[in-house]
Regions:
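Helical segment within the ABC ATPase nucleotide-binding domain
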Residues: 112-124
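Conserved ABC ATPase signature
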Residues: 73-77, 81
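Catalytic Walker B motif of ABC-type/P-loop ATPase nucleotide-binding domains
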Residues: 98-102, 107
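H-loop (His-switch) and adjacent beta-strand-loop-beta switch element
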Residues: 143-159
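ABC ATPase nucleotide-binding domains
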Residues: 159-193
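Hydrophobic anchor residue at the start of the ABC signature
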Residues: 87-88, 115
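Conserved ABC ATPase "signature" region
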Residues: 36, 50-69
């Protein structure tokens, strides 16, 4: 009949947390409703949420430090608080793979460290694919790295050598000081990449 029907088991394969979720912050939706919207792909647009689904949303919000904001308007939250809520939204349907696009871009450094700790815990039960330009920071938290700059460079480890960095066509130096990695970029020479 030309219709592609996915089994229910494939509908929740992915969860997605964007770099910045753009929305009208005056839109009258509360934190719980945002988290529950992560179930829309399996429920459809016009079905109401069950008590068990609401409880799962509240449990996730409690787990990630947002329990006190369950009924707060989403537009009243800080950047870090919104990322927690959108993370709950991304995982409420129990995906097998979580895709993150620059998830710490708009958060402060205190929350950034906490966020990576949350991801480490989540990574015990699901796979995580993260896009980041902050190679120096994520090296401490990831198992493998795939770098893309004109071509794909896959590293089956979180360790990258100076020789490997040269192949990225962009001068990068990594310095690690204890558990706090740093990234220093040299200035590009004119006419060179």
């Amino acid at each position: 009949s030309g219709e592609v029907i996915y089994p229910v088991s494939r509908q929740n394969l992915f969860g997605y947390l964007p770099q910045n979720s753009r929305f009208d912050q005056r839109f009258p939706i509360d934190v719980t409703e945002v988290v529950l919207s992560g179930l829309m792909s399996e429920k459809g647009l016009y079905k109401s949420y069950t008590r068990a689904e609401k409880q799962k949303a509240w449990d996730l919000l409690d787990q990630y430090g947002m329990g006190a904001y369950k009924k707060a308007p989403i537009g009243d939250l800080s950047g870090g608080q919104m990322q927690r809520v959108f993370l709950c939204r991304a995982i409420i349907a129990s995906p097998r793979i979580l895709i993150l696009d620059e998830p710490t871009t708009y958060v402060d450094s205190n929350f950034e460290k906490e966020f990576y700790t949350i991801l480490e815990e989540l990574n015990k039960s699901l796979s995580i694919v993260m896009v980041s330009h902050d190679l120096g920071t994520i090296c401490s938290y990831v198992k493998t790295i795939a770098c893309v700059n004109r071509e794909l460079h896959y590293h089956n480890s979180n360790l990258i050598s100076a020789e490997q960095l040269q192949s990225y066509h962009c001068p990068i130096e990594l310095i690690t000081h204890g558990k706090i990695p740093h990234r220093v970029l040299k200035e590009h020479e004119k006419g060179k990449q």
